[in-house]
């Protein structure tokens, strides 16, 4: 976003002060939208010396004469030119400024506007700044942050020792990554994105996006009235073992619930009977295995089954042993269809196989699986969108790095999903997602599109659960997917 600001100013000739004025006014309008008539409130505006502080002075000036009271506490040591300019304007308009923060001052105001640090902050917050932020967080006042809560790294969402906990954050142009990755997402509060006049094509040139309702609605496959099951694709799911009999069913039903025409399950016998007995919609093919796990002896049979489908999902409930490892890697190396690779298939995957494949692949790891795949710690990979992009690009695949904010990337374009709740933190929900992605690929979406639509709907369905989210199960999630699609189309 910094580069877009600079291009807007230098290449398009938009005065930086105009951008700052629009930013400040947009904050006032957003507060009015959230709080109602601002005349009932008293505002304390905390300004640093950077351009974020300059935005704060614009906010304060535009509140003069509108609200009960407004006071700026200047917390900087020196000011950028645009901050200096708006400080001067605020003073000329009769605005009050103090340069010493007294804890008792918080008692005199209803709303605190945080314009201390913006997106340029990199070092940790210590000393007086940390003390002030902690006092603001404990004050119980309504807190509005300008652009990003002070103390959040706008590129990662990490807390730089301490950070403001906002009720409302007003940002400019596009959401920042720090707003959508945790813990920054928890501290942002309600996020409003204001258009302050950047050229549209510069905004559109950004290759990292938040997945939106409108985006997903536009990608949903059409359902022509004159159609048949072949119109909506065929999926093969290779899954299950003597240890895990439910995973194949959850994946299979995930595919059917998003509209797939036909779903076959290849499951070790007798575990396949569970699908046959409970879900007659699923075609369950019994696979004779050695000790209940897939091995190379099942390779040709599974390749044969893959010939008359559009996409293969592999991994849920396979188990993790040397026989499974050999089977998965040889199967994927030989398979000439798109593949969705999940769970145990990721745990045993040799990534060199991905480079050898000529057909598309989607990988859907959670952070633990991703850490094992790239031989790093969970902390190194969780929310690490740059690592995800690098992996996807190097291995010519789509990566769906699952977490509370899920990252979807093909290495060129990256999307962040923010739907969902803690009810998805439960065994089986990932199996459902695997089936959904395979189902949308079968219906004609690209692997990136299918992954984008699926993660959004998966989370949206969880949000529709009528009871406390902790009681959500994968089976309940399946029930809610069609309702999520119906509401999306409204």
From Swiss-Prot:
Signal peptide extent: none
YjeF C-terminal domain sequence ranges: 212-488
Catalytic activity, as annotated: (6S)-NADHX + ADP = AMP + phosphate + NADH + H(+); (6S)-NADPHX + ADP = AMP + phosphate + NADPH + H(+); (6R)-NADHX = (6S)-NADHX; (6R)-NADPHX = (6S)-NADPHX
Pfam families: Carb_kinase (PF01256), YjeF_N (PF03853)
Binding site for ADP: 402-406, 421-430
Binding site for K(+): 52, 114, 150
UniProt: (6S)-NADPHX 1 binding residues: 129, 147
Protein name, UniProt field: Bifunctional NAD(P)H-hydrate repair enzyme Nnr
Species per Swiss-Prot/TrEMBL record: Thermotoga maritima (strain ATCC 43589 / DSM 3109 / JCM 10099 / NBRC 100826 / MSB8)
Gene it is expressed from: nnr
